[in-house]
Each structure stands twice: as structure tokens, then as C-alpha cells.
A protein has these predicted regions:
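Phosphate-binding site recognition
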Residues: 1-225
Length: 225
């Protein structure tokens, strides 16, 4: 990129979709993860890349991995399930968007709300976009996330009784909100320090909702339940 920039004078816009795929799928391969993080740091960190990179946009499920307590790429501005900022309406479908879809596809809005609503981001109700689109095209109310690889991967976590985790999950399934400390999570999907780390991971994956004001996690909707 540096050589092309030197020859053409043009800067690049870099887009990486699912930047965290190696963090999730190669969780046990620490060497590969470190090589990948070092690659990203070499590409984006410091003043040198700004000579030839105009903008970098990374999307993924997890926040940028931390090294000890510091972000591996601290020159990025992050928008997450815990802190979506002013991008909250773009994390999924809003109430108004779902109402419009229900009208166009002749669906009962309250039933759609019961199944796929429940995420609370920056005070806004947000719906699971994949599930809503699948409902509109397939015309069946059901759990669409059980068909994904991520769902299979988290089953061992849900079945753990790590630090009382199973009891907390059961409480949430019955409708309870449970307190969670989301700030200790290091984005490490192998070495969970406590049940709060697991719950925070599930919040990032979208399997739990999070009320930032109350600092509590909950089951967001019927699809997850």
C-alpha cells in the first residue's frame, strides 16, 4: 500500500468485515492470534499508516482484543453492544422499520416484537435483523439463530456451572434481570475469569440484552428464550 501510494499519490479506504473471525474460530491458537493482532497493529497503528490510509472500517462481533488492559488498536473508535454511541439505530432494525416491514409483509407487529425485539441500545429498542428478514422471507416464527455456527459454539458455555453461571442463566430464562460487570472482559474467548466474562461475551454475541443504566443482563426475546 505504501509503494502504491508513493507511485500514485492516492490514499486507501480499508474495509475488513468480520475482523474477529480468527479471534473466535482460532481461539485456542494463541500464536496465530498474536501474529494476526501484530499484523493489524503494523497496518493501522502509529503515524506511518496515515500517510497512505485515509480511513479504516472494521466490523465484527467482538470488540478489539485487549492486551492486558489496553486495546491492541487504540487508535480506533469502537461502537459495541455495550457502548453503541450514536450508531445504535444501525445495529439492527428499529421499531419504525419493523412496523413498516410488518405492514408490507402482512405480519402482526406485536408478535414480531415478542419474538425478535428486546435489545436496548442507547435507550432504543433494536430488533435482530437476521431473524426479522428470515421471518419476512420464510413466513415462519421460529428461532433462526439456532441454525448458526455461533449458537453451537456457545452451548458448552451455557451448560457450564462456572461461578454459578447455570443458576444465573436459569434465573434469566424465568424473566429475571441479573447484575453483570461488563468491564473486566478481555475479549478472550477461552480464559474466562468469572461468570461476568461469560455473560459479557454473550451480550456481545447478541444472546443477552444489556441495560446500561441498571448494569443488568437479560434474555431479550422469545427467539433466544
Amino acid at each position: 500500500l505504501s509503494l502504491i501510494n508513493a507511485d500514485s499519490g492516492q490514499k486507501f479506504i480499508v474495509i475488513i468485515d468480520e475482523w474477529d473471525i480468527l479471534i473466535r474460530d482460532e481461539a485456542h491458537n494463541q500464536t496465530l492470534q498474536e501474529e494476526y493482532i501484530n499484523f493489524l497493529r503494523g497496518m493501522f497503528k502509529g503515524s506511518e499508516p496515515t500517510r497512505f490510509i485515509q480511513l479504516a472500517y472494521l466490523t465484527g462481533i467482538l470488540p478489539i482484543k485487549k492486551i492486558k488492559t489496553q486495546s491492541a488498536l487504540n487508535n480506533f473508535e469502537e461502537f459495541t453492544m455495550l457502548d453503541p454511541g450514536n450508531l445504535a439505530p444501525y445495529f439492527g432494525f428499529t421499531n419504525e422499520e419493523v412496523k413498516s416491514l410488518c405492514q408490507n409483509y402482512h405480519k402482526n407487529f406485536e408478535e414480531v416484537k415478542h419474538w425478535y425485539d428486546g435489545y436496548l441500545l442507547a435507550g432504543q429498542q433494536i430488533y435482530n435483523p437476521k431473524a426479522v428478514v428470515s421471518l419476512m422471507t420464510r413466513n415462519i416464527f421460529k428461532n433462526y439463530w439456532s441454525e448458526t455456527g455461533t449458537y453451537t459454539a456457545i452451548l458448552p458455555l451455557i451448560n457450564m456451572n462456572f461461578d454459578g453461571l447455570k443458576n444465573v442463566i436459569i434465573e434469566m430464562l424465568s424473566g429475571a434481570f441479573v447484575p453483570v460487570n461488563v468491564w473486566s472482559f478481555q475479549n478472550d474467548t477461552i480464559n474466562f475469569a468469572n461468570k461476568d466474562d461469560v455473560l459479557t461475551y454473550l451480550i456481545h454475541l447478541g444472546y443477552l440484552g444489556y441495560d446500561a443504566q441498571k448494569q443488568m443482563a437479560f434474555i431479550p426475546n422469545e427467539e433466544i428464550r
